[in-house]
Curated annotation (Swiss-Prot):
Classification via Pfam families: zf-RING_2
Summary of the function given for this chain in its UniProt record: E3 ubiquitin-protein ligase that acts as a negative regulator of NOD2 signaling by mediating ubiquitination and degradation of RIPK2. Also catalyzes ubiquitination and proteasomal degradation of CANX within the endoplasmic reticulum. Could have a role in spermatogenesis.
GO annotation, biological process: protein ubiquitination
Organism ancestry: Eukaryota, Metazoa, Chordata, Craniata, Vertebrata
UniProt keywords, alphabetically: Endoplasmic reticulum, Glycoprotein, Membrane, Metal-binding, Signal, Transferase, Transmembrane, Transmembrane helix, Zinc, Zinc-finger
Parts of the chain on the Cytoplasmic side: 172-327
Gene Ontology MF: a single term: zinc ion binding
Residue ranges covered by zinc fingers (RING-type): 209-252
Domain of life, source organism: Eukaryota
Metabolic or biological pathway: Protein modification; protein ubiquitination
Species the sequence originates in: Mus musculus
Protein name in UniProt: E3 ubiquitin-protein ligase ZNRF4
EC number(s) from the headed UniProt entry: 2.3.2.27
Chain segments annotated as transmembrane: 151-171
Length: 327
């Protein structure tokens, strides 16, 4: 499940990282709007139309119009070009003349000293603007390259940082279940290995211990290895502590985490075996021996031959029960 989720998320994460780190060209579009200014006509030339003059307002280059103004301007069939000039010491007449040569039908300039305005009739409209028009005058030279568009660096960097943080959180959220599954899987394997060797309490007479060669007695604690071999706890624990690798003394099968991960329980003929595990051989033999003794105790032999016959019958019954249990 975790691999399937990662396979589904990986392409989206790679595309997101590529979009965040890649540089793309940016185009800025300027919306043109119509603005009305309060103006007064100059005391010369043709009077201003009472309906007011409307045109396409452009900033003069250079802004003070002390030299020839750059032109022509972009063609606009609906409006005539109007020039916006910043007064920096040049005469008003020279400014109007340069605007006329550049193709403008009107010029908007600041006032000169009183009494210095002289009229000339060939310039159609000349307007004297107050403070609202001066707001449009730039404080620095305009960008000479038409492809140069200013970009707010701070906002672009912030947008990239937010996109990178969001993509990182998304990838970590998708990978967290997979990492947590790996950790829980390792814990489950360790617990399962520790539970392979179990300590049980012996309740019936059975075989002897292969280490000390003593018979198992009722009430003794035995340790059963995954290979189904059982030993006294007092015998197998020193064996594991001295051995370089933990293995069964009889079959030499490796039994990892047997000594430290032992669990306590009780073994008896009445208790069912562990789920998924067959009962060990010594337990089956103990059951057969007890069953055989019960059958012998029930039969009361009167003669030697009858005793032999009863013993043979008991052994046949015990063998049939053992065959059914092993199957």
């Amino acid at each position: 499940m975790a691999r399937f989720a990662w396979t589904r998320v990986a392409p989206v994460a790679l595309v997101t990282f590529w979009l965040v780190l890649s540089l793309s060209p940016t185009d800025a579009q300027v919306n043109l709007s119509s603005v009305d200014f309060l103006d007064l006509p100059a005391l010369l030339g043709v009077p201003v139309d009472p309906k007011r003059a409307r045109g396409y307002l452009l900033v003069a280059r250079p802004a003070d119009a002390c030299h020839a103004i750059e032109g022509p301007w972009p063609d606009n069939h609906s409006l005539d070009p109007l020039v916006l000039v910043r007064p920096l010491g040049c005469s008003w007449e020279q400014t109007g003349r340069r605007a006329q040569r550049a193709g403008a039908t009107a010029a908007s300039v600041g006032p000169e000293a009183p009494g210095q305005l002289r009229e000339f009739e060939d310039l159609e409209v000349t307007v004297r603007c107050d403070q609202p028009a001066r707001v449009l005058l730039p404080h620095a030279e305009p960008c000479p390259d038409p492809e140069c568009h200013p970009v707010v660096v701070a906002s672009w960097a912030l947008a990239r940082a937010l996109a990178l943080a969001a993509s990182t959180l998304f990838v970590l959220r998708q990978l967290w279940p997979w990492v947590r599954g790996l950790g829980s899987r390792g814990t489950a394997v360790k617990t399962q290995t520790c539970q392979k060797a179990q300590v049980r309490t012996f309740t019936r007479l059975s075989d002897l211990c292969a280490i000390c060669l003593d018979d198992y007695e009722e009430g003794e604690r035995l340790k059963i290895l995954p290979c189904a071999h059982a030993y006294h706890c007092r015998c197998i624990d020193p064996w594991f502590s001295r051995a370089a690798q933990r293995s069964c003394p009889l079959c030499k099968q490796s039994v990892a985490s047997t000594h430290d991960g032992s669990t306590d329980g009780s073994v008896g003929g009445e208790e069912p075996p562990l789920p998924g595990h067959r009962p060990p051989i010594w337990a089956i033999q103990a059951r057969l021996r007890s069953r055989r003794l019960e059958l012998l105790a029930r039969t009361v032999p009167c003669r030697r031959c009858s005793s032999t016959t009863s013993l043979g019958v008991a052994e046949n019954v015990a063998q049939s029960e053992a065959t059914s249990e092993l199957s």
